[in-house]
Design a protein with these regions (language model features):
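P-loop (Walker A) phosphate-binding loop of NTP-binding proteins
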Residues: 10
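Conserved lysine of the Walker
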Residues: 15
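ATP-dependent small-molecule kinase phosphotransfer cores
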Residues: 32-93, 114-118
Length: 190
């Protein structure tokens, strides 16, 4: 049995994409906390924020994280604010390692400016100038980045192509004793 690989980072860091690539490469199930919440509730993330506020959404997120922490051998893509709660971090560390995908704010703006902010309520949804998006990301990053670094087992530069980031995560995991199974070691070494 191996530990879950839990990806954290700012919105636009590539967590969902890298998680899918890792899942394919390692033969692991991928769980995206936002997708799980949408599946549980039948509602979009912006709808949940409007109906229940951020605190109500965070409680749903906590329940999803707690449930996912009962499994092993997952790749988990976490919402950007999931690790702000200590109880989520405690749950994740029971069966997983936390990998922080770090991306400069300017790269995040590039990734989000063409509609990528639409379903991200903490960015204020669509519209606004690139400068406004940059300022919102800087403000959000100012509070979140120190927390990501605090809780992560490793911080990785994720500003490059997603396939390279996934390979970097695998290289790190290979150097750990309890992240990959022996068969996963063999699989990625061939």
């Amino acid at each position: 049995m191996s530990r879950n690989i839990c990806l954290v980072g700012m919105m636009g860091a590539g967590k969902s994409t890298v998680a899918e690539l890792l899942g394919d490469r390692l033969g692991r199930r991928v769980a995206d906390t936002d997708d799980e919440i949408r599946g549980w509730t039948g509602r979009s993330i912006p709808e949940l924020f409007m109906e229940h506020g951020e605190e109500g959404f965070r409680e749903l997120e906590r329940q999803v994280v707690e449930e996912l922490a009962t499994f092993h051998d997952l790749v988990v893509s976490l919402g950007g604010g999931a690790v702000l709660r200590d109880d989520n971090v405690s749950s994740l560390l029971l069966t997983g390692v936390i990998v922080h995908l770090d991306v400069p704010v300017e790269v995040l703006v590039e990734r989000l400016r063409d509609g990528g902010a639409d379903d991200r309520p903490l960015l204020g949804g669509p519209g606004g100038t690139e400068e406004e998006l940059l300022e919102r990301l800087r403000s959000t990053g100012k509070t979140r980045d120190p927390r990501y670094r605090e809780v992560a087992d490793v911080t990785m530069d994720a500003s490059g192509p997603a396939d390279q980031v996934a390979e970097d995560v695998i290289a790190w995991a290979l150097a750990q004793t309890d992240v990959l199974t022996p068969s996963e070691h063999e699989q990625v070494m061939t």
